[in-house]
Swiss-Prot record:
Its EC number is 2.7.4.9. It comes from Streptococcus pneumoniae (strain ATCC 700669 / Spain 23F-1). GO terms for biological process: dTDP biosynthetic process; dTTP biosynthetic process; dUDP biosynthetic process. The gene is tmk. Phosphorylation of dTMP to form dTDP in both de novo and salvage pathways of dTTP synthesis. This is Thymidylate kinase. ATP binds at G11, P12, E13, G14, A15, G16, K17, T18. It holds the Pfam family Thymidylate_kin. PANTHER family: THYMIDYLATE KINASE, UMP-CMP KINASE 2, MITOCHONDRIAL. InterPro entries: P-loop_NTPase, Thymidylate_kin-like_dom, Thymidylate_kin_CS, Thymidylate_kinase. GO terms for cellular component: cytosol. Belongs to the thymidylate kinase family. Keywords: ATP-binding, Kinase, Nucleotide biosynthesis, Nucleotide-binding, Transferase. GO terms for molecular function: ATP binding; dTMP kinase activity. The lineage of its organism: Bacteria, Bacillati, Bacillota, Bacilli, Lactobacillales.
């Protein structure tokens, strides 16, 4: 690659993004692709500290706008410190959540103004958008059941939210898919992991122009 390529992974809780990414990494490295994987919120020291505040299950009193602004602050620091340098170095950067999460969770889920969120995203990223977004779609009930069955996964504040919020979040993602279908590709995350990995690999390789 002559320049970097930015991929974001999105989806409701329990969609299995992390498991797919773990399976893809050795395949990409075998292809000789320089890959940086990172996550939001987090990715850098300041971002991880903000992540702790956002996801702490005891912070049930957090206001929706406070939550949004914390995500935006983490996003900016993460980009400047880690993502942009990697893209400038020509690497493939795969982010576990990015700008679409704010629209889905704080916009559709919390009911905050979408235009305000778009402006804040623009402000924090200087207009940077992913070259490709992989949206892992799963029914809300199935995703939450996966989380409940996974004893290794630490429960966070968002996991404790009611079913209604998670359904609104999924609708937010589907709305984004309709609006930006040229950038966002939907992947059926309810299928067995091996199939999800193969589909993701095919979509990613096609987007990057890599031979399968």
């Amino acid at each position: 690659m002559s320049k970097g390529f930015l991929v974001s992974l999105e989806g409701p809780e329990g969609a299995g993004k992390t498991s797919v990414l773990e399976a893809l990494l050795p395949i990409l490295k075998e292809k000789g692709v320089e890959v940086l994987t990172t996550r939001e919120p987090g990715g850098v020291l300041i971002g991880e500290k903000i992540r702790e505040v956002i996801l702490d299950p005891s912070h049930t009193q957090m206001d929706a706008k406070t939550e949004l602004l914390l995500y935006i602050a983490s996003r900016r620091q993460h980009l400047v410190e880690k993502v942009l340098p990697a893209l400038e170095a020509g690497k493939l950067v795969i982010m576990d959540r990015f700008i679409d999460s704010s629209v889905a969770y704080q916009g559709f889920g919390r009911g905050l103004d979408i235009e305000a969120i778009d402006w804040l995203n623009q402000f924090a990223t200087d207009g940077l958008k992913p070259d490709l977004t992989l949206y892992f779609d799963i029914e809300v009930e199935e995703g939450l059941a996966r989380i409940a069955a996974n004893s290794d996964r630490e429960v966070n504040r968002l996991d404790l939210e009611g079913l209604d919020l998670h359904k609104k979040v999924r609708q937010g993602y589907l709305s984004l898919l309709d609006k930006e279908g040229n950038r966002i590709v939907k992947i059926d995350a309810s299928l067995p992991l091996e199939q999800v990995v193969e589909t993701t690999k095919a979509v990613l390789f096609d987007g990057m122009g890599l031979a399968k």
